[in-house]
């Protein structure tokens, strides 16, 4: 009996446990997690990615003339000829890069259609900003393509060899790509150029096929990737040269922000790239340079300037109506139906038109407004979201500009901020200089002359961080009255995030120094 009761008790306990477990699971289902509430709202975006700068649209409103001009120049590549080099100018957000990428995609698509070996390699010179890095990136790209080509060629030859083992007459038909070294599609589906598939070579024996395979494998073994540092530049260039010339191709090299490369590394890269065609045997190279600075060629060697700037295309700023058209095209894809109130696109276009017709700014503004609306779990994007987005973007811009200022400019700005933060407004250059000198002494930094500090204040004024106005003091002459144009709290946080400026603890003595020379 004792054992039976124990069994019954265990069964009852098991049933009780099952009920309790079910209750726990029900409670967990009812309990909303961190993201459940955020996901409960109706999404506003259909495809947010089309509003990002990295997206290349299928249509570029108001840029047909520039696109057709580029296509007219680059069509030479599809005839196996060397296209003229192109320099593209225009301010930020005028569609330069998007248009060039659009034309490049069309060029590569058409080259595949007609089996012409042509490819476009894009380099952002704001990131890849030295001759070594540019040449290394290009060399490694072409080395990868050449390895894929060799693998495809070896696979074809191996197939032919297998056929010859079964039937010696197979050698009479040919069946392998030949020594005219142009690419093919590899057995793995890797797209190397299709143009060599019609070129054949004849083999008299299986031994000749084996020799050809050995030769290709030796080629591949010599295709060494360039490390991102450590080699002499002339070795990097030689590796790039051999890689681009290994197969027959027209290579269009697109250098975005080309002025940043020249500014940091000089024009040696452009000199080498623009003059290498005279030494190439199999390939041809063309350059597309994209710049925000219409005057950057003034700093080039005359020989580089003449060969690089064979064709020039200028992208003018968009006006408000054109920006509205661009926003309409993108918003149709980016947002759910009826997600935007009627005044959103005109307001985004108007704000961006004030920023020299910057389409990138307009798209960024529209995307940010949509994100703010989603965070509010609003049903629509409204004018208020656009205005808040404008404030947020402007603050983000200021933070980034301040963060990247040179140390001396930060010290000058910090001196102005300390005065404003302690109730001293519309200060003059002398007052700022007194505080600046004290800060330099505190941090053991070099002290610039007052004339140089005045220049730094003018630079901060041009960046929109301070407002410096020349005012007349009558018989005392003229002076600059300086005030902050950015939020004090956010600016102070960015400056104090600098490891050197964060060492300053007590600001009171610095403000008091303002009165020492009065």
Curated annotation (Swiss-Prot):
It comes from the Archaea. One of its GO terms (molecular function) is ATP hydrolysis activity. Residues 165-196 are annotated as: Disordered. Keywords: ATP-binding, DNA replication, Nucleotide-binding. InterPro entries: AAA+_ATPase, AAA_16, Cdc6_C, Cdc6_lid, ORC1/CDC6, Orc1/Cdc6_arc, P-loop_NTPase, WH-like_DNA-bd_sf. Disruption phenotype: Not essential for normal growth. SMART domains: AAA (SM00382), Cdc6_C (SM01074). It holds the Pfam family AAA_16. Residues 186-196 have a biased composition (Low complexity). One of its GO terms (biological process) is DNA replication. The keyword Nucleotide-binding applies. ATP binds at residues 94-98, 318, 330. Involved in regulation of DNA replication. Required to initiate DNA replication of the circular chromosome at a nearby autonomously replicating sequence (ARS) oriC1. Belongs to the CDC6/cdc18 family. This is ORC1-type DNA replication protein 7. It comes from Halobacterium salinarum (strain ATCC 700922 / JCM 11081 / NRC-1). The lineage of its organism: Archaea, Methanobacteriati, Methanobacteriota, Stenosarchaea group, Halobacteria.
């Amino acid at each position: 009996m004792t054992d039976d009761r124990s069994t019954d008790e265990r069964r009852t306990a098991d049933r009780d446990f099952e009920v309790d477990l079910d209750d726990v699971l029900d409670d967990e289902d009812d309990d909303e997690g961190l993201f459940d509430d955020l996901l409960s709202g109706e999404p506003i975006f259909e495809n947010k990615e089309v509003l990002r700068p990295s997206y290349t649209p299928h249509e570029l409103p108001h840029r047909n003339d520039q696109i057709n001009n580029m296509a007219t120049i680059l069509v030479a590549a599809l005839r196996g000829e060397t296209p003229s080099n192109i320099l593209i100018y225009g301010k930020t957000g005028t569609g330069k890069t998007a248009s060039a990428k659009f034309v490049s995609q069309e060029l590569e698509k058409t080259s595949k259609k007609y089996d012409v070996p042509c490819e476009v390699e894009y380099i952002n010179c704001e990131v890849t900003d030295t001759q070594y890095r540019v040449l290394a990136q290009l060399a490694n790209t072409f080395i990868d393509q050449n390895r894929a080509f060799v693998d495809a060629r070896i696979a074809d030859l191996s197939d032919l060899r297998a056929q010859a083992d079964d039937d010696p007459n197979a050698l009479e038909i040919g069946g392998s790509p030949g020594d005219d070294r142009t690419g093919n599609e590899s057995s793995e589906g890797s797209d190397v150029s299709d143009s060599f598939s019609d070129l054949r070579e004849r083999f008299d024996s299986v031994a000749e096929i084996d020799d050809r395979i050995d030769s290709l494998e030796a080629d591949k073994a010599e295709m060494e990737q360039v490390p991102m540092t450590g080699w002499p530049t002339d070795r990097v260039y030689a590796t790039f040269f051999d890689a681009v010339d290994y197969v027959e191709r027209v290579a269009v090299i697109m250098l975005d922000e080309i002025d940043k490369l020249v500014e940091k590394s000089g024009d040696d890269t452009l000199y080498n790239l623009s003059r290498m065609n005279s030494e190439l045997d199999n390939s041809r190279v063309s350059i597309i340079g994209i710049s925000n600075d219409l005057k950057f060629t003034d700093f080039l060697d005359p020989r580089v300037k003449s060969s690089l700037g064979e064709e020039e295309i200028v992208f003018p700023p968009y006006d408000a109506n054109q920006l509205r058209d661009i926003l309409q095209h993108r918003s149709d894809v980016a947002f759910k139906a009826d997600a935007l109130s009627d005044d959103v696109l005109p307001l985004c276009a108007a704000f961006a038109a004030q920023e020299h017709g910057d389409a990138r700014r307009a798209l960024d503004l529209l995307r940010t407004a949509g994100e703010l609306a989603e965070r509010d779990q609003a049903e629509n994007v409204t004018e208020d979201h656009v205005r808040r987005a404008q404030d947020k973007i402007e603050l983000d811009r200021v933070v980034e500009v301040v963060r990247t200022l040179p140390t001396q400019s930060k010290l000058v700005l910090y001196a102005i901020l300390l005065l404003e933060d302690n109730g001293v407004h519309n200060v003059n250059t002398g007052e700022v200089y007194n505080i600046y000198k004290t800060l330099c002494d505190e941090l053991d930094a070099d002290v610039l002359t007052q004339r140089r500090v005045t220049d730094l204040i003018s630079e901060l004024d041009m960046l929109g961080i301070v407002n410096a106005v020349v005012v007349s003091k009558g018989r005392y002459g003229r002076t600059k009255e300086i005030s902050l144009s950015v939020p004090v709290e956010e600016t102070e946080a960015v400056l104090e995030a600098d490891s050197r400026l964060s060492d300053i603890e007590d600001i009171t003595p610095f403000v008091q120094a303002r009165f020492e020379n009065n």
